[in-house]
């Protein structure tokens, strides 16, 4: 797959509107108390110690959270004081909840004014972050949240801004910029500017330009927060240019970004043997939900169809389908209506489904970053999971070696039998 195609696949980034949205890293799935790990329930303090609004604490209790994760423990006390934050922490650690709770805590809603702007690089992620805001603002009825991204009519967005102006806007840079340029979206009252999966937006020059133009439309005095699972040393200075003396938090070194509780294996086979092997594994493995990653839209459609024909309850998500259809299918999978999802990289970054406990790389990801974000779909927030990667040629083997070197992890060949308790939580 050409590099250009990969970018299109990942970002679905279009020239006329920068319409991409980043991912909620999921303040979902409460930590299981019996799981040992560096970040699960390691702090005896609860969310109450942050002195959050009672309305927020009620929503947190409703979501089933008791103890903040390490990244939440490190970031929230400073973030709620309005400090700029630059944070890297591995997938599944609840980064989304940091900025959602910090901005809701500080928000003083003013009718007709947008106070919070959150941008991310994929539409699905924008949608998910907006849902997190709705979840945590459950007992704050005056707070309005809206999500704007390309692929849907801009007229509807303009209508929302005119008739029911939100206090919190989540969106992708292209659509946000289009709305700001045509004066539908007024950014003069922004108090909190957040980039989620910031490296994806700032590494690409065209998207970075859009973010910079939007940034210049906001007031000088504001809080800036940026989050990502991967922040290279090269991109950090770029992030800092947007900030004033930020608090920098890097939870776990880059080489330790692999996930606690996630079993990782590979299977060596020919390309034409993948289907049979996949069906065999789906037959013998125990799973709640599974995500299968493929490299193209065509393979995504064909494999999903094949799985259904073999009586596996599969659903596909890819960039070739209309936006409404994509979001509807994402919601179906999240609501457990289907247990198997076949997806392109479009789904790979930041999307949070807490029941997924197995991720398959049917096709090898193009680099170690993509590998991390794909396998992070299983084993979210300290729960157990299994990642199985199909290796069918020398290039696949090279990428797998890169992954092992970079993250200092040993990925071994899939054994004939796997202990079920190593990749699925046992119900008590």
Swiss-Prot record:
Its EC number is 3.6.4.13. Its main location: nucleus. The keyword Coiled coil does not apply. CDD domains: DEADc_DDX39, SF2_C_DEAD. GO terms for molecular function: ATP binding; ATP hydrolysis activity; ATP-dependent protein binding; identical protein binding; mRNA binding; RNA helicase activity; U4 snRNA binding; U6 snRNA binding. Residues 261-422 form the Helicase C-terminal domain. The modification N6-acetyllysine is found at residue 36. A motif (Q motif) lies at residues 45-73. One of its GO terms (cellular component) is spliceosomal complex. The helicase C-terminal domain mediates interaction with ALYREF/THOC4. Homodimer, and heterodimer with DDX39A. DDX39B interacts with the THO subcomplex to form the THO-DDX39B complex which multimerizes into a 28-subunit tetrameric assembly. Component of the transcription/export (TREX) complex at least composed of ALYREF/THOC4, DDX39B, SARNP/CIP29, CHTOP and the THO subcomplex; in the complex interacts with THOC2. THOC1-THOC2-THOC3-DDX39B subcomplex is sufficient for the interaction with export factor NXF1-NXT1. TREX seems to have a dynamic structure involving ATP-dependent remodeling. Belongs to the DEAD box helicase family. DECD subfamily. Involved in nuclear export of spliced and unspliced mRNA. Component of the TREX complex which is thought to couple mRNA transcription, processing and nuclear export, and specifically associates with spliced mRNA and not with unspliced pre-mRNA. The TREX complex is recruited to spliced mRNAs by a transcription-independent mechanism, binds to mRNA upstream of the exon-junction complex (EJC) and is recruited in a splicing- and cap-dependent manner to a region near the 5' end of the mRNA where it functions in mRNA export to the cytoplasm via the TAP/NXF1 pathway. This is Spliceosome RNA helicase DDX39B. It comes from Bos taurus (Bovine).
């Amino acid at each position: 797959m050409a590099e250009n195609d990969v970018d299109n696949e990942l970002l679905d980034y279009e020239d006329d509107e920068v319409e991409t949205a980043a991912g909620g890293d999921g303040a979902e799935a409460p930590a299981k108390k019996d799981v040992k790990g560096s970040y699960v329930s390691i702090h005896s303090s609860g969310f109450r110690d942050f002195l959050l609004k009672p309305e927020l604490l009620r929503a947190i209790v409703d979501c089933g959270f008791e103890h903040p994760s390490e990244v939440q423990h490190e970031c929230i006390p400073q973030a709620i004081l309005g400090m700029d934050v630059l944070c890297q922490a591995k997938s599944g650690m609840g980064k989304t909840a940091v900025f959602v709770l910090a901005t809701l805590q500080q928000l003083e809603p003013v009718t007709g004014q947008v106070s919070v702007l959150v941008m991310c690089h994929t539409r699905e992620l924008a949608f998910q972050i907006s849902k997190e805001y709705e979840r945590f603002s459950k007992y704050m009825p005056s707070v309005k949240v809206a999500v704007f991204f390309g692929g849907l009519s801009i007229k509807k967005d303009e209508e929302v801004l005119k008739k029911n102006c939100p206090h919190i806007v989540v969106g992708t840079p292209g659509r946000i910029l289009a709305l700001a340029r045509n004066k539908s979206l007024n950014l003069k009252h922004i108090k909190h500017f957040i980039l989620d999966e910031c490296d994806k937006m700032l590494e690409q020059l065209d998207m970075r330009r859009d973010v910079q133009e939007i940034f210049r439309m906001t007031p000088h005095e504001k809080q800036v927060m940026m989050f990502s699972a991967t922040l290279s040393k090269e991109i950090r200075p770029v992030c800092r240019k947007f900030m004033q003396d930020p608090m920098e938090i890097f939870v776990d070194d880059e080489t330790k970004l692999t996930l606690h509780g996630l079993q990782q294996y590979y299977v060596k086979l020919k390309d034409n043997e993948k289907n049979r092997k996949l069906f065999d594994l789906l037959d013998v493995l125990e799973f709640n939900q599974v995500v299968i990653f493929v490299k193209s839209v065509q393979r995504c459609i064909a494999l999903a169809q094949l799985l259904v024909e073999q009586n596996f309850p599969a659903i596909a998500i890819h960039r070739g389908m209309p936006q409404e259809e994509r979001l509807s299918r994402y919601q179906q999978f999240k609501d457990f209506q289907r247990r198997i999802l076949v997806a392109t990289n479009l789904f790979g970054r930041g999307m949070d489904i807490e029941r997924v406990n197995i991720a398959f790389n049917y096709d090898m990801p193009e680099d170690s970053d993509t590998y991390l974000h794909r396998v992070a779909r299983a084993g979210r927030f300290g729960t157990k999971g299994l990642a199985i990667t199909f290796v069918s040629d020398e290039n696949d083997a090279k990428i797998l070696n890169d992954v092992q070197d970079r993250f200092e992890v040993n990925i071994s060949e899939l054994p004939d039998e796997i202990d079920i308790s190593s990749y699925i939580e046992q119900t008590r």
